Amino acid sequence: MRQLAELLTDLLGPVPTMFLWVIVSFAFFRALQFIVRWYLFGKWTWPNFNFFDIRNRIRRRRRGGQEAENTENPPENEAEAGEQVEQEPEPDSRDLSAIPPNKKWRISNECVSLFHSVISGLWAAYALLYYKQLVQDLVNYRCDVAINLVLMSAGYLFHDLVDLLVNEQSARIIELLFHHVVVLSAFAVTMFFNRFLGVVVFGLLMELNSIFLHSRSLLNLYGVDKKSPSFRIIALLNMVTLFAFRLCVSAYLVYFVVVSIPDLEWYVSIINGLVIASLASTNTVLTYRLLAADGLLGSRRTRRTPAATAETQVGDVESGPLRTQVEDEDHHTIGVQTIHGTTEDATQTV
C-alpha cells in the first residue's frame, strides 16, 4: 500500500494524489451506502423528504381554511381572530426526528456512519498510541498513517454531505451540515498547510464515542424500549465515551489553542480557535441533549423513544409515511400527525 502511494505521488504529485484518495474513499462509502440499503431493505433509493415543502403546504392549507371559516363565521374582533390562528402550533422539523418519515434511509445512513466511526475511531487511537510524536508535537509532526486517516474521513464526510442533501431537507440536518463543514475545514488546513495533523487526529478520537451514539440512534429507530438491558448498556457506554472522548478531548484542544497562541501566527490562532470552539460548542449541545433524552435532567425534559406505529414499522413501509407520491392533502396529514404524535429524541439529530 505504501509503495502504491509513493508511486502515485511520483506520477501525479502530492496534491493530486491526496484528491485521488479522497475520491476513492468517497466512492467506497457511496457504494457501501447502496449495498447496505439493498441488503437491509431490497431497495436502492427512496423518495426525497423535504420538511420545508410540507410546512409551507400546511401553512397554505391553514390560511385557506381560516379564510373559509372567517367567511362563514367572521370573528367579532381582532383578538378572537388571532386566537383562531394560534390554535394549531407551528410545525418544527426537529420533532420529525422521533418518527422519521424517511425511516429506512435513516437506518441505512446510520449503519454506514457506524461503520466509519469504528474504523476511524480505532485508527485514530492506534495512530496516537504508536506514534508518540503526534501527541508531543501537535503542530508540525506528520506521518502517513495519520494522513491516510484524514483522507479517508474526508471522503466519508463528502459522502455523508451528499447523502443528507439528496435525501432530506429539514432543520435537523443543518446541525449535521455545520459539523461536517467545520471538520472538513480542519482537514483542509492540515492537508494544505502541512500543520496541525496531531490536532486533527485527536479530534477524530471523538469517533470512538460516535460508535455508541450511532448504535443508540439505531436502537431508537427500531423502537427498542429504553428500559431494555440492551438500550441501557448502550446508553451507559455512550455517556462514558462521551465524557472521555468528546468532552475531555475538547477541553484538551481548547487548552492547546490557548497555550499555543504565543508560538503561532495570529491568523492561525484565530482559525484554530474558531474550529475548536465550534466543535466544543456542538459537543456541549450534544451532551445536554443526551442527558435530557436519558432523563438525567428531570422527567420534564425526558424524550420518548419513537412510537411503533403501523405507518412507521420498518418492515411494513417503503419509506415511512412518504412511501409513495402523495397528494397535497396527504402531505398535510403526514406533517401534522408526525409532529403531534410524538416527542423528539434529539440523539438522532447528531
UniProtKB/Swiss-Prot annotation:
Regulates the composition and fluidity of the plasma membrane. Inhibits the incorporation of membrane-fluidizing phospholipids containing omega-3 long-chain polyunsaturated fatty acids (LCPUFA) and thereby promotes membrane rigidity. Does not appear to have any effect on LCPUFA synthesis. Ubiquitously expressed. Residues 65-100 are annotated as: Disordered. Residues 102-279 form the TLC domain. The chain crosses the membrane at residues 9-29, 111-131, 145-165, 173-193, 195-215, 229-249, 270-292. InterPro entries: TLC-dom (IPR006634), TLCD (IPR050846). Residues 75-90 have a biased composition (Acidic residues). This is TLC domain-containing protein fld-1. Disulfide bonds: none annotated. The keyword Transcription does not apply. Changing E207K: In et47; suppresses the saturated fatty acid toxicity phenotypes of paqr-2 (tm3410) mutants (specifically, withered tail tip morphology and glucose intolerance). Changing H214P: In et51; suppresses the glucose intolerance defects of paqr-2 (tm3410) mutants. GO terms for biological process: membrane assembly; phospholipid homeostasis; plasma membrane organization; regulation of membrane lipid distribution. It is a multi-pass membrane protein. The keyword Nuclease does not apply. One of its GO terms (cellular component) is plasma membrane. It comes from the Eukaryota. Keywords: Cell membrane, Membrane, Transmembrane, Transmembrane helix. It holds the Pfam family TRAM_LAG1_CLN8. It is found in: Cell membrane. Its main location: membrane.
